Amino acid sequence: MGEGKGENKWGAAQMSNNPIRNKDFKVFGLVEKIYEQKGEFVKLFAEIKKKLYSMSIEQLLLMPSYARSKLKDEYGHIEFEYAGYGDRIVIVKLEDPWTDDTNKRQGKTAFLVYFSYQTSKPLVPAQITYKIRSIFKTMKELNQKGYRVFPALFANSITPGALKILQNPKINIRFFSDVNDLLNWIYSKVLNRLKKIVEIAKFTLKFDKIFTFLKTIIAGLGYEVPSDILMAWASKPVRP
């Protein structure tokens, strides 16, 4: 029996001269790329969580709840979950180690990223209305739980008109098409929090745990804390 048209001897489809079929291959490749970058994003924070606790996610899940709660208070907490239609939204939650300072009981930050699989053409204004509503709905739920939320939309490409809508101060959703740019944005937000702590906090053991928590996240993202920030924190007088 001869081989079917458009297939190799292993039955795998080949690119044809049909422009419509070739377009389908291109679109599939772009969707696959978004899936891969979404997977890389989640995997990276899973690795950071392992480094934070010096144990695997599986080991954490086997621990009793009171022990996990103690770890969270001591070292801080990193969690990621999915939301929205088709789990298109990835939420990364960061919670500081616990401190009894009345001005800083527990810092909660969430990075909310909507991964769009619309790849046949750049996103246009009409296509982002639902995405914005979905992002805002999830943001509201996180805000009610005490999180400061930083939202982003991740897609293959976007038109200037759609980007302008996202940049509206009343919407203020960042757009990314490359996972490294997304991670750099998260790094900048975490670094700003670290700078703020150095500026306003006294050097106590509890605040040093928060500093270490944020420093661990920065290292896990592939960056380093600037030496001047490290020196400024280390030079603060030690308080009980």
Swiss-Prot record:
It comes from the Viruses. This is Uncharacterized protein ORF240. It comes from Acidianus two-tailed virus.
